[in-house]
């Protein structure tokens, strides 16, 4: 053994070829944490000291290659400021450079995921061989940063500026065919041939049949473009990238382009310094803090879900009650992920609608070449429409998705319970109605749970799993595991009106109503909140949700939280409802809707909308300060999120933030309500609440925040 470290081993194979093997002990994946980087340095020294080594094959002892840097170390590193970040990166560059500069050929044998720092290590090698099962990429942009271990410098010299920008800005892992086509890897082979193929390349390099030194030299020099070609390449890249990423919201793509341009005419070492300086600028932005926090929160949520696996019982057969758009969407989602599902309704027209929805979604998958026609047929065969309960004795879980009316749901749930086995779990897809209340209609409330999908089911990643007063842990666990199997992210919440997401969303709509009442133009509110980062403003959102749905939901919330959610005035949303303007459902709401050339509903300004709400505007019509609109909208939403933590509706800030991002489109680069409060400053946020407390209870700072401010505490760190 030439080197035996905690993360890397080096041992001789044959013919002067040694295996340089990454296998981080005590971890399921390889990653570049501090320990690995130190061991990397030691392993390089061991190779340098051994004169018998003529070439290296770089391998992994894990099912993945190297997943990247250790993201949990970023917070501490990035908090030190730009200079400290550059001071941290430059020694890492020296280690990577010393590996690249070894006077012998190196071939990376990429067996699985090689992402971020993992692929940057592959780029240091002279050749890259990729398994057919592997993927490679530089996805750091998703974290609000960009490649910092030399990836931007080496990839742009290897595959050209335009391709490199696309790889890094899109942040999508590349499959073998795409990586080979672009020139990022040199060969793709079957998994069982990987080591042999990599070893053969090393042999060819050692023998002189491959000019590995010339290939390496390309990465050490400036980009091979003259100044005019460079200018054209970067202008094109900037146009493409900045059209998709607003620098005010996502600064990393522009900083990446700036550093690439600064380093393009420089040799490797100077270009790496430009990369490090640009990386540091990105790393200290609040967006990077939020997006890295989001990644870590996602891991927290996944870990919480995984803990339910042991307590779940298998779901071999599911059923859904209600075959409308929602029922059809649920059936599609279950069937497409391999779970057979019965779809029941009371009439053939409803069943036809549900099957049509599933068929349409599957057809789109085939058209996008994400599914073969034969797979579509197999998936449709897993959905069995029926008008009776005859087959329900074989069902493990029933998902009720009938109309959002407590009396209707209670009747349907009680009837269902009589037609299933004693251990069958019944889940309600209610969006606002208390699970504990609905459970009173059942003989076995321990088997009853909430399973709230968001619309459209096939696109929205979140499922709220709601624990009622008597819901068993087995029911929770089974529902969580089914949601995961359906390709969703489940978050377990305790019962209350609106649960977590809708309980938080309705104060946001309430804040909108109050702003309009006070004289704000709803179009200004929409524009301000869109620029703030929301996918759409609140007026447009309630049109999309359905104004009737919003009004009915608001009634449930007002009953549950009368002190904060029962206004003493009629608002613009209710005025629209009374005027039978339901939003996109009937093409008139706050906006008017007409089909565009692609057949999608496009909004246009409708003067009638202003006439409808005019009698309910009591404030002076005026142009509001944009920040006042942001503060009033965000305080109501964030305060209710904190109250959900206070009331133990949701267990952690991580889960609360993830739910808001996945459930209602909270701007990801702001990290969620709790992260937003942290970045505002808890004490400063409480002061804002006090400033607007005269507007009502929804604006009063929760006691949790006052305590945190007094003790200088944050949600994160």
Swiss-Prot record:
InterPro entries: 3-OHacyl-CoA_DH_CS (IPR006180), 3-OHacyl-CoA_DH_NAD-bd (IPR006176), 3HC_DH_C (IPR006108), 6-PGluconate_DH-like_C_sf (IPR008927), ClpP/crotonase-like_dom_sf (IPR029045), Enoyl-CoA_hyd/isom_CS (IPR018376), Enoyl-CoA_hydra/iso (IPR001753), FA_oxidation_alpha_subunit (IPR050136). One of its GO terms (molecular function) is 3-hydroxybutyryl-CoA epimerase activity. The record marks 120, 140 as: Important for catalytic activity. One of its GO terms (biological process) is fatty acid beta-oxidation. Its EC number is 4.2.1.17, 5.1.2.3, 5.3.3.8, 1.1.1.35. The active site is at 452 (for 3-hydroxyacyl-coa dehydrogenase activity). The keyword Lipid metabolism applies. Substrate binds at residues 298, 502. PROSITE patterns: 3HCDH, ENOYL_COA_HYDRATASE. Keywords: Fatty acid metabolism, Isomerase, Lipid degradation, Lipid metabolism, Lyase, Multifunctional enzyme, NAD, Oxidoreductase. NAD(+) binds at residues 326, 345, 402-404, 409, 431, 455. Pathway: Lipid metabolism; fatty acid beta-oxidation. Residues 313-717 are annotated as: 3-hydroxyacyl-CoA dehydrogenase. It catalyses: a (3S)-3-hydroxyacyl-CoA + NAD(+) = a 3-oxoacyl-CoA + NADH + H(+); a (3S)-3-hydroxyacyl-CoA = a (2E)-enoyl-CoA + H2O; a 4-saturated-(3S)-3-hydroxyacyl-CoA = a (3E)-enoyl-CoA + H2O; (3S)-3-hydroxybutanoyl-CoA = (3R)-3-hydroxybutanoyl-CoA. One of its GO terms (cellular component) is fatty acid beta-oxidation multienzyme complex. Transmembrane segments: none annotated. NCBIfam families: FadB, PRK11730.1. Involved in the aerobic and anaerobic degradation of long-chain fatty acids via beta-oxidation cycle. Catalyzes the formation of 3-oxoacyl-CoA from enoyl-CoA via L-3-hydroxyacyl-CoA. It can also use D-3-hydroxyacyl-CoA and cis-3-enoyl-CoA as substrate. In the N-terminal section; belongs to the enoyl-CoA hydratase/isomerase family. In the C-terminal section; belongs to the 3-hydroxyacyl-CoA dehydrogenase family. Heterotetramer of two alpha chains (FadB) and two beta chains (FadA). This is Fatty acid oxidation complex subunit alpha. It comes from Acinetobacter baumannii (strain ACICU).
């Amino acid at each position: 053994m030439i080197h035996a470290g905690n993360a890397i081993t080096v041992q001789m194979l044959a013919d002067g070829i040694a295996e340089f093997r990454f296998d981080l002990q005590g971890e399921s994946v390889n990653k570049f944490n501090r320990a690995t980087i130190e061991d990397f340095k030691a392993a390089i020294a061991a190779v340098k000291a051994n004169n018998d080594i003529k070439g290296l094959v770089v391998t992994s002892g894990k099912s993945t290659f190297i997943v990247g840097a250790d993201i949990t170390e970023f917070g501490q590193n990035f908090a030190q400021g730009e200079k400290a970040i550059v001071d941290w990166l430059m020694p890492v560059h020296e280690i990577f450079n010393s590996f690249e500069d070894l006077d012998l050929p190196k071939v990376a044998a990429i067996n699985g995921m090689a992402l971020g720092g993992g692929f940057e290590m592959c780029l240091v090698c002279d050749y890259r061989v990729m398994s057919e099962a592997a993927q490679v990429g530089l996805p750091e942009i998703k974290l609000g940063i960009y490649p910092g271990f030399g990836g931007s410098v080496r990839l742009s010299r290897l595959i050209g500026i335009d391709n490199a920008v696309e790889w890094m800005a899109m942040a999508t892992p590349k499959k073998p065919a795409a990586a080979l086509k672009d020139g990022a890897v040199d060969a793709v082979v079957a998994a069982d041939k990987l080591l042999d193929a990599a070893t053969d390349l090393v042999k060819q390099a050692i023998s002189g049949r491959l000019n590995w030194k010339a290939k390496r030299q390309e990465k050490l020099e400036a980009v091979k473009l003259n100044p005019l070609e460079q200018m054209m390449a970067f202008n094109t890249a900037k146009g493409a990238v900045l059209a998709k990423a607003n620098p005010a919201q996502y600064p990393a793509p522009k900083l990446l382009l700036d550093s690439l341009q600064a380093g393009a005419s420089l040799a490797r070492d100077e270009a790496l310094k430009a990369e490090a300086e640009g990386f540091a600028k990105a790393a200290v932005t609040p967006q990077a803090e939020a997006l890295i926090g989001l990644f870590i929160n996602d891991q927290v949520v996944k870990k919480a879900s995984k803990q339910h696996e042991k307590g779940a019982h298998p779901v071999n057969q599911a059923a859904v009650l209600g075959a409308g758009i929602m029922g059809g969407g649920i059936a599609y989602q279950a069937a497409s992920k391999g779970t057979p599902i019965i779809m029941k309704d009371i009439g053939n027209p409803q069943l036809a609608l549900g099957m049509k929805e599933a068929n349409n979604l599957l057809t789109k998958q085939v058209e996008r070449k994400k599914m073969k026609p034969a797979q579509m047929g197999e998936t449709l065969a897993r959905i069995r429409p029926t008008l009776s309960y005859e087959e329900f004795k074989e069902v493990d879980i029933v998902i009720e998705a009938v109309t959002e009316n407590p009396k209707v749901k209670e009747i349907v749930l009680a009837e269902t319970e009589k037609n299933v086995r004693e251990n069958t779990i019944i889940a309600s897809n209610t969006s606002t109605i208390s699970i504990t209340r609905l459970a009173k209609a059942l003989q076995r409330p321990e088997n009853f749970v909430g399973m709230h999908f968001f619309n459209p089911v096939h696109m929205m990643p979140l499922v709220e799993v709601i624990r009622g007063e008597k819901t068993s842990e087995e029911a929770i666990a089974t529902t969580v595991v089914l949601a995961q199997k359906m390709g969703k992210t489940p978050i377990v919440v305790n019962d209350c009106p609106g649960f977590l997401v809708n309980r938080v969303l309705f104060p946001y709509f309430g804040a909108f109503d109050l702003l309009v009442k006070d004289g704000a133009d709803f179009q200004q509110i929409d524009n301000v909140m869109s620029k703030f980062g929301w996918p759409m403003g609140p007026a447009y959102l309630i049109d999309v949700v359905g104004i009737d749905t919003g009004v009915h939901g608001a009634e449930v919330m007002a009953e549950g939280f009368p002190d904060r959610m029962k206004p003493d005035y009629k608002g613009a949303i209710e005025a629209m409802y009374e005027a039978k303007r339901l939003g996109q459902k009937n093409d008139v709401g706050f906006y008017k809707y007409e089909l565009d050339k692609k057949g999608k509903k496009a909004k246009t300004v409708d003067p009638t909308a202003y006439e409808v709400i005019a009698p309910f505007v009591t404030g002076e019509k005026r142009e509001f300060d944009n920040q006042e609109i942001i503060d009033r909208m965000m305080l109501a939403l964030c305060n209710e999120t904190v109250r959900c933590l206070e009331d133990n509706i949701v267990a952690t800030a991580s889960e609360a933030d993830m739910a808001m991002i996945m459930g209602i489109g909270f701007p990801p680069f702001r990290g969620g309500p709790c992260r937003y409060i942290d970045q505002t400053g808890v004490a400063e946020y409480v002061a804002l609440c006090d400033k607007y407390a005269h507007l009502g209870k929804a604006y009063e700072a929760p006691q949790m925040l006052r305590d945190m401010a007094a003790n200088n505490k944050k949600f994160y760190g």
